[in-house]
Amino acid sequence: MAKEKDEALSPQQEKLKALQAAMSKIEKDYGKGSIMRMGDEQIDNVEVIPTGSIGLNAALGVGGYPKGRIIEIYGPESSGKTTLAIHAIAECQKNGGIAAFIDAEHAFDRFYAAHLGVDVENLYISQPDNGEQALEIADQLIRSSAIDIIVIDSVAALTPKKEIEGDMGDSAVGLQARLMSQALRKLTSTISKTNTTCIFINQLREKIGVMFGNPETTTGGNALKFYASVRLDIRKVTAIKDGDNIIGNQVRVKVIKNKVAPPFRKAEFEITFGEGISKIGEIVDLGVEYEIIKKSGSWFSYGDSKLAQGRDAVKALLKDNPELCEELEAKIMEAIADKK
């Protein structure tokens, strides 16, 4: 009798035994790793694809766009949404990755992409006829497990087949939202399993009749808002001029949603027409912010030596001295890492 009592399991042990049996069956049915206890394995750092901007890498908290996740980049027209996505493709290719671009807008500029560092010869591009075709192509590419990053430009251009085949005046309320909801339900687990970074570019619209609060909303319904791990809001701050000519824009990117690090951080940088994100401009600005470059009046100095007078002169100096530029970048990266 006493022996039976010793062998009797406590309620907690009974639970664990039942759980172990369930886990064994799940692993047998769906494969090893389909369920695990978080404490059994050390969680690795989040794998990322750099954004092409030092400041934005820091604002995202993990050093770039997380792999195996959905990213949404949205903002007003000509704010730099596609430029950000193209920079991500360039960074992915630099590290040996394979990239695809679903050009639903039929507006991809291969020469601009090449200027930004994209290997256009090895970029896979599709210009689909309708939204269903675009998302089906994206799904098949992701399922191949061969693609590291895929960009869909843009959600607003993912027009449902029914709307394209109908007449101009036909009502198509909610068709695109339903299409996005169905597609994202299907895509999410595949994106995670294949470790693909999926970037959706989206546009802004204004809700009619909103008296209070923000009337702005993104296209394609609410599904993307929920499924996206990272949402970036990009806006123009000021125009950059060379005399009377506008040569680019100063933009601000706000991390509206972030499931892998704290959200609501911001990054500001220059986007120069034809060249993309100004890395040297960022190095100057972040160098001053982290007190690596000292600014006194209009003079900039580094260590014991004066660099130049005026920000543009410093940028020109760093452009001609890549070693100094790399040294400053390394010190900025150290300062960002220490701040975390």
UniProtKB/Swiss-Prot annotation:
Localisation per UniProt entry: Cytoplasm
Keywords: ATP-binding, Cytoplasm, DNA damage, DNA recombination, DNA repair, DNA-binding, Nucleotide-binding, SOS response
Keyword 4Fe-4S: no
Residues where ATP binds: G75, P76, E77, S78, S79, G80, K81, T82
GO CC annotation, single: cytosol
CDD domains tied to this protein: RecA (cd00983)
Leader sequence segment: none
InterPro entries from the UniProt entry: AAA+_ATPase (IPR003593), DNA_recomb/repair_RecA (IPR013765), DNA_recomb/repair_RecA_CS (IPR020584), P-loop_NTPase (IPR027417), RecA-like_C (IPR049261), RecA-like_N (IPR049428), RecA_ATP-bd (IPR020588), RecA_C_sf (IPR023400)
GO molecular function per UniProt: ATP binding; ATP hydrolysis activity; ATP-dependent DNA damage sensor activity; damaged DNA binding; single-stranded DNA binding
GO annotation terms (biological process): DNA recombination; DNA repair; SOS response
UniProt keyword annotation of ATP-binding present: yes
Stored HAMAP family: RecA
Function: Can catalyze the hydrolysis of ATP in the presence of single-stranded DNA, the ATP-dependent uptake of single-stranded DNA by duplex DNA, and the ATP-dependent hybridization of homologous single-stranded DNAs. It interacts with LexA causing its activation and leading to its autocatalytic cleavage.
Protein name as annotated: Protein RecA
Organism: Xylanibacter ruminicola (strain ATCC 19189 / DSM 19721 / CIP 105475 / JCM 8958 / 23) (Prevotella ruminicola)
Taxonomic lineage from the root: Bacteria, Pseudomonadati, Bacteroidota, Bacteroidia, Bacteroidales
Gene name linked to the record: recA
